[in-house]
Amino acid sequence: MPIQQKRSLTSIVSYPERGDGGNNKYRGNCSPELIKDLISHFSLKEINDYMCGSGTTCDAANDMGIGSNVYDLHSGFDLLHHDIPERSGFTFWHPPYFDIIQYSDVMYSAAEIQQKYGYDPRQSDLSRISTWEEFVKAMNYCMMKQFCALEKGGRMAVLVGDIKKKASSTV
C-alpha cells in the first residue's frame, strides 16, 4: 500500500489537484484524493459505494490496497428498488445534485442498460426527478436505506455541494 500523507478532514474539503481515478469526463465525479483520505483517516479495509458513477471509489480503493463493493444504475444496481447486497462497515455516497447534471441518456445510454439489465434506469435516476420535494424524498429514502445496511458501528460519508440557480443558492 502506498504511503499516504494524512490530511485533516473537515466539513469542507478542497483538492486543487484532482488526482488519478475515475473518469474526469464523467460529470460530477469527485477527486479520488477525498476517498483516499477517508480510507486513511478511518483505517478502512473495505469501502462501499452504491452510486459509484465513473468508478472513482473503486480506483481509490485499489490504489490504497483495500477492497471495494461499487454499484450504479449503469452497471445493473438500482438503489431505489434493489436490496443492498452486503452489510457495510463504511459507505461513501456522492448523490446527484437534483437536476444539475442528468445521468441516464446523457452520461450513458438508458436503452443499453435496459437491454443488458432489464430495467429502464431513467425511472430510478435521481437526477431526473422533476420536483425538489420528490427529489428530497428519494434522497432521504436512499440515505436511510444505506444507513440501515451499515454494520453496527459502521460509518457513512456523504459528499454534497451547493445547488445554485440564477445566482442564488437553493440548498
Residue ranges and their predicted role:
Residues 1-171:
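Class I S-adenosyl-L-methionine-dependent methyltransferase catalytic core
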